From Swiss-Prot:
CDD domains: ATP-synt_V_A-type_alpha_C, ATP-synt_V_A-type_alpha_N, V_A-ATPase_A. The keyword ATP-binding applies. It comes from the Archaea. HAMAP family: ATP_synth_A_arch. Its main location: membrane. It comes from Ignicoccus hospitalis (strain KIN4/I / DSM 18386 / JCM 14125). GO terms for biological process: proton motive force-driven plasma membrane ATP synthesis. This is A-type ATP synthase subunit A.
């Protein structure tokens, strides 16, 4: 029996309703005559506090509030990829067709998945009537896009992963809509019809069998990220930075070039023109791993700053639920959230309207636990169903601290829960050094875990070279103060070599043009070769300096090769690595000729 109450008070996106006996926490309710979507966030006696995911302008006391009896859930099934949704997973293209308007009308109800489209269903050949099935067992597959084969699973909220149901019937191969029954199972004496889609509550993590340490790097094609501060598949990372430092471009680079199988891009409370830019450009980008259009592996959730504040909070959970769903199929999914600061501001706004006690800078006291809930849904895991498979959810989120202050609550709490911290620096951005990742503040706790992959697939010397590159950059930072005070002439010859090598690292390796067709994506092999040239140059030059050869002489001898190395970012394609091998040989030859 649906709960029926009425509006008592309206405070922006928060509505207080009375006569709500029997309503449950996080239950979805329809508010007002237009049936606006809301979620119960607090219950006191017969009163319920509801956060509404649509504009509440014009709602008056006394209007009806009707419970739906279920928590806020999203539809999971074929038809999610290559589409754009709003913060509560309503497809924007369908809304545009129904509303005949560029704006989302209040109370509009459009299903997330297309009910009329027919999909090519292929049943699992290993299953037959009478077999026992559990939650997350694969019933069959659907080619959702040319890149992704959608695996239709037994919903774990219909048949638990630790229980068994009997398969009564499995649909033969053919074309079906998502509303057609594709299997019938008997569980606890009841026959249950299964369809290609099911609903899942966004605040509830999907079950896993066991979680593993992430050991495979997420290859992004960005040299400073892959080599100095690597992210692992199943890892968590944050990109904090002040206004204009390049957060959105860095995240877009991750979405476009990373080797994740499925990318969910959540624009949470950011500007509408940034989301428009993604929409305009992504269909033209090609996936570097397959050559297919990028949209075939991407889901976009647009929840811009002019959309209702409450929907920002939901959009983050919607995104991570989609990522977990594709992880359960055995894929590596990447969730990109831009930005969690706007999400935290939405929490602050709603908490203020609910008259909750504020904590630091007005944020609610539970900010840290909400951030922890979100980041803990990342990970590499074994999925409980059959056939056995392993998938991962990687989370990379932007943080927008006001004025670039990393001590503010959202950034400081985020640092506790993420293992990769890519700190963007306004001074580097203003100096046109992009990506503006500060190598002195940033860190990655996955360096040792992903080193094995680099050693087995690229070179056993990867970690040795990477650590030496970091130590050169750290030494150069110590020397910069001396150079500022007394000039570079006062430095010893070994210190001058550190300064010169650090300059080459910054110009040839750390800087990267996200809009150049060649430099936008740098393969792991090219990254290693460029690093090898720089570090072996430094080692050989150090021997010469110790033998009495001045740094000025070394610089003059290899100036053409250094210029060519810097140009190689734009001139050497990922499949033309013999050019870098040739450049390495010329470097060593020139340096050998200087031996006293």
């Amino acid at each position: 029996m649906a709960v029926k109450g009425k509006v008592l008070r309206v405070r922006g996106p928060v509505v207080i309703a009375e006569d709500m006996q029997g309503v449950q926490m996080y239950e979805v309710v329809e508010v007002g005559k237009d049936g606006l979507v809301g979620e119960v966030t607090r219950i006191t006696g017969d009163k319920a506090v509801i956060q509404v995911y649509e504009d509440t302008t014009g709602i008056t006391p006394g209007e009806p509030v009707v419970g739906t009896g279920s928590p806020f859930s999203v539809e999971l099934g074929p038809g999610l990829l290559s589409h754009i949704f709003d913060g509560i997973l309503r497809p924007l293209e369908s809304i545009h067709e129904v509303a005949k308007s560029p704006f989302i009308k209040r109370g509009i109800k459009v299903p997330s998945l297309d009910r009329s489209k027919k999909w090519e269903w292929r049943p699992n050949p290993e299953l037959k009537p009478g077999d026992k099935v559990s939650g997350d067992d694969i019933l069959g597959t659907v080619p959702e896009t040319p890149l992704i084969e959608h695996k239709v699973m037994v919903p774990p909220n219909v048949v638990p992963v630790d229980k068994a149901a009997t398969l009564k019937w499995l649909a033969p191969a053919g074309e079906y809509t998502i509303e057609d029954t594709i299997a019938v199972v008997e569980y606890e004496g009841k026959e249950i019809e299964l369809k290609m889609y099911h609903r899942w509550p966004i605040r509830r993590p999907r079950p896993v069998k066991e979680k593993f340490e992430p050991v495979t790097p997420l290859i992004t094609g960005v040299r400073v990220l892959d080599t100095l501060f690597p992210m692992a598949k199943g890892g968590t990372g944050a990109i904090p930075g002040p206004f204009g430092s390049g957060k959105t471009v860095t995240l877009r680079t991750l979405a476009a070039w990373s080797d994740a199988k499925v990318v969910i891009y959540v624009g949470c409370g950011e500007r509408g023109n940034e989301m428009t830019d993604v929409l305009v450009n992504f269909p033209h980008y090609k996936d570097p791993w397959s050559g297919r259009p990028l949209m075939e592996r991407t889901i976009l959730v647009a929840n811009t700053s002019n959309m209702p504040v409450a929907a920002r909070e939901a959009s983050i959970y919607v995104g991570v639920t989609l990522a977990e769903y594709y992880r359960d199929m055995g894929y590596d999914s990447l969730l990109i959230a831009d930005s969690t600061s706007r999400w935290a501001e939405a929490l602050r706004d709603i908490a203020g309207r609910m008259e909750e006690m504020p904590a630091e800078e007005g944020f609610p006291p539970y900010l840290a636990s909400r951030l922890a809930e979100y980041y803990e849904r990342a990970g590499r895991a074994r999925i409980p169903g059959r056939p056995e498979r392993v998938g991962s959810v990687t989370i990379a989120s932007a943080v927008s601290p006001p004025g670039g202050d990393f001590s503010e609550p959202v950034t400081s709490h985020t640092r506790r829960f993420v293992r990769v911290f890519w700190a963007l620096d306004a001074s580097l951005a203003y100096a046109r050094h992009y990506p503006a990742i500060n190598w002195l503040v940033s860190y990655s706790l996955y360096v040792d875990t992903v080193a094995k992959w680099w050693h087995e697939n690229i070179s056993p010397k990867w970690k040795e070279y990477r650590d030496e590159m970091m130590s050169i950059l750290l030494k150069e930072d110590e020397l910069k103060e001396i150079v500022r005070l007394v000039g570079p002439e006062s430095l010893s010859e070994p210190d001058k070599l550190i300064i010169e090598t650090a300059r080459i690292i910054k110009e040839a390796f750390l800087q990267q043009n996200a809009f150049d067709p060649i430099d936008a994506f740098c393969s792991p092999k090219k990254q290693f070769l460029m690093m090898k040239i720089i570090i072996d140059f430094y080692r050989k030059a150090k021997e010469l300096v110790n033998a009495g050869v001045p740094v000025a002489t070394i610089r003059e001898a290899v100036k053409e090769e250094v210029a060519e190395l810097i140009r190689s970012r734009f001139t050497v394609r990922n499949e033309e690595l013999e050019k870098l091998e040739d450049l390495y040989a010329r470097f060593m030859e020139k340096l050998s000729s200087l031996s006293p």
